Structure formats: structure tokens, C-alpha cells
């Protein structure tokens, strides 16, 4: 199979099967490209109806940098769910490095994040993310993740002892 054939797309329902986040903290609407063990590209359509715009900032709404980082981390978390043996594990980010913001993200923007897997060792992973609106660079960061067992799986395992 060549690289082009391995590109996948995920809709919101498929993303919600992978990530535990829900509104208002689910910050990825769709995955437009996913190449297992390589990268994922995710999209967040930013609307004026986002709850954070009520206070950040009235009359001059911009997406908080912490939520831009969270959107990048969520795309990175999806990328780490492939290969198949990682499915069902919860991607928890354990660190951020080299965080850079270049220009604000505003209502009406379509925030596109590319998350490139740099390293996976056991259940630990490192992902480099960059996000854009159109051709305009918005932010980048390196994320460290741990792929954790879900709490309900731990409880099941303990009950089966």
C-alpha cells in the first residue's frame, strides 16, 4: 500500500470515539488527513457562539492561547491513537515545549492543525503541532503525551482478579 492510500478521514462521531472530550472542551470538528504513525490534520471551525468569547474579550473576541494549545493537543492525541494497539487508551498530555503564538484566532476562522508524530516509546509520545488559518501561521508547540488506560478498564481489571 502506498502512502496516499493510507490517508484516512474522521468525522466528529469517530473523533468522539477516540477522545473523551465533549462540548465545550472538544476542540476538533473533523480530521481531514490521518496517516498512521506519521501525522494528522484536524479542523476547528471557530464561531462567535463559543462560550469563551463572552469574556475573552468583549468587543474584541479572540480565542485564548490555552485553548489553541488544547486544540493542537487534541489533534495530536488523535494521531497517537494509530497504530491500532493504541486505540482505547486515553491520550493525556504531560508537557508542552516551544509554544509560540503569532497572531490571534477570531470568530469565523477555520483553525487547521497539523500534528506530526516525532517519537513513540511504549505509551509515551512526542508530537509537534502547527496551526494555521488559511496560509497564516497562528501557533506551534511540541507536546508530550502519556497513553493511559481508561478508568473504567482499570476497575474492570481489578474486579476480575
Please place each PLM-identified region on the residue numbering.
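N-terminal leader/capping segments at the start of a protein or of a new domain
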Residues: 1-33, 161
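Active-site helix/loop of acyl-thioester processing domains in fatty-acid/polyketide metabolism
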Residues: 31, 63-86
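HotDog/MaoC-like acyl-thioester-processing domains
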Residues: 7, 36-37, 106-109, 116-161
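Hydrophobic beta-strand-centered segment that forms part of the acyl-chain substrate-binding groove
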Residues: 3-9, 76-112, 138-146
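Catalytic strand-loop segment that frames the active site of acyl-thioester-processing enzymes
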Residues: 23-63, 68
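Beta-strand-rich interaction surfaces with strong enrichment in secreted/lumenal proteins
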Residues: 16, 59, 101-103
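Hydrophobic residues on conserved beta-strands that form the core of alpha/beta folds
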Residues: 28-29, 96, 126, 140
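Conserved positions in beta-strands of structured domains
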Residues: 29-32, 97, 102, 114-118, ...
Amino acid at each position: 500500500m502506498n502512502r496516499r492510500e493510507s490517508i484516512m478521514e474522521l468525522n466528529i462521531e469517530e473523533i468522539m470515539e477516540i477522545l473523551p472530550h465533549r462540548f465545550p472542551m472538544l476542540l476538533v470538528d473533523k480530521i481531514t488527513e490521518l496517516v498512521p504513525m506519521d501525522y494528522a490534520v484536524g479542523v476547528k471551525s471557530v464561531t462567535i457562539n463559543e462560550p469563551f468569547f463572552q469574556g475573552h474579550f468583549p468587543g474584541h473576541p479572540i480565542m485564548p492561547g490555552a485553548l489553541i494549545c488544547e486544540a493542537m493537543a487534541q489533534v495530536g492525541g488523535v494521531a497517537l491513537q494509530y497504530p491500532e494497539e493504541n486505540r482505547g487508551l486515553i491520550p493525556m498530555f504531560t508537557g508542552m515545549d516551544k509554544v509560540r503564538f503569532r497572531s490571534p484566532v477570531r470568530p469565523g476562522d477555520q483553525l487547521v492543525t497539523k500534528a506530526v508524530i516525532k517519537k513513540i516509546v511504549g505509551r509515551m509520545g512526542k508530537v509537534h503541532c502547527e496551526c494555521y488559518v488559511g496560509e497564516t501561521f497562528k501557533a506551534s508547540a511540541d507536546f508530550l503525551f502519556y497513553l493511559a488506560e481508561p478508568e473504567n478498564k482499570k476497575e474492570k481489571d481489578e474486579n476480575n482478579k
